[in-house]
A protein has these predicted regions:
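Short conserved segment of the HATPase_c
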Residues: 157-169
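Short beta-strand/loop element within the Bergerat-fold HATPase_c
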Residues: 135-146
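Conserved C-terminal segment of the DHp
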Residues: 30-45
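Conserved glycine-rich
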Residues: 134, 192-193
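Conserved DHp (HisKA) dimerization/phosphotransfer helix of two-component histidine kinases, i.e.
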Residues: 33-34, 49-98
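Residue-level recognition of the "H+4" position in the DHp/HisKA helix
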Residues: 19, 26, 30, 171-172
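Conserved catalytic submotifs in the C-terminal HATPase_c
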Residues: 102-110
Length: 215
């Protein structure tokens, strides 16, 4: 039997909280450093304006990140809904209005969870793939009582630590990384699922996996 602490949603929230607090500490540390710099300039009779402006910018970033993370951590679970997995994936792909998305395979299964949150999770993965400007393929698969959608596009993940793309402050040119992927992982975990990123040759594969709903 799985203990409460080992459940996907608990593990995902714990991981998010660790990363969130680390990312929040980074701009706050910068605020402290620049305020100290402003004080030293002031004591020398110099203009502290530049240091104060940088401190203000970092403080605004920290506050924005804090509000987003707080909202996410305090969000209450909503009504559980059961729906067809394949239809859900197809609607999400068509909803983007992208012509270069190909869907292969089928599962014939159902999943259950907060549909609006799962919509957001799948959308975050799709948007990242579509923004790569390459042809995107989606492969549906059923394995060991789990339903999976693999979203593939040409591209490269960071070779040092792909997991940092799930960090709330992570970002990239034209990418919806960061809080979008962090939210996707949390929302999938709330439904007993997982979100993974992997590199296969010259292609990035984002996988959203959910337990099949029986009956």
């Amino acid at each position: 039997m799985t203990s409460p602490q080992d459940r996907p949603e608990v593990s995902a929230r714990r991981q998010f909280l660790r990363t969130f607090l680390h990312d929040l500490a980074t701009p706050l540390s910068a605020v402290s450093l620049h305020l100290e710099g402003a004080n030293r300039r002031l004591q020398r009779g110099d203009d502290p304006g530049e240091s104060l402006e940088i401190a203000r910018t970092e403080l605004a970033r920290a506050f924005d990140l804090f509000e987003q993370g707080r909202e996410l951590l305090l969000a209450q679970p909503s009504t559980k809904e059961t729906f067809l997995f394949d239809d859900w994936v197809e609607r999400a792909a068509h909803g983007l209005g992208a012509d270069d998305v190909r869907i292969e395979g089928s599962t014939g299964g159902k999943v259950a969870g907060d549909r609006s949150k799962l919509d957001e999770a799948l959308s975050a993965l799709l948007v990242n793939a579509v923004e790569s400007k390459e042809i995107v393929s989606m492969v549906l698969e059923k394995r060991d009582g789990r339903l999976q959608v693999h979203i593939e596009n040409r591209g490269l993940l960071p070779t040092d630590d792909p997991e940092r793309l799930f960090a709330p402050r992570s970002s990239g040119p034209g990418k919806n990384w960061g809080m979008g992927l962090a939210r996707a992982r949390l929302f999938a975990a709330d439904a007993g699922g997982v979100v993974r990123l992997a590199q296969y040759g010259d292609r990035v594969v984002a996988t959203l996996e959910l337990p099949e709903e029986r009956g």
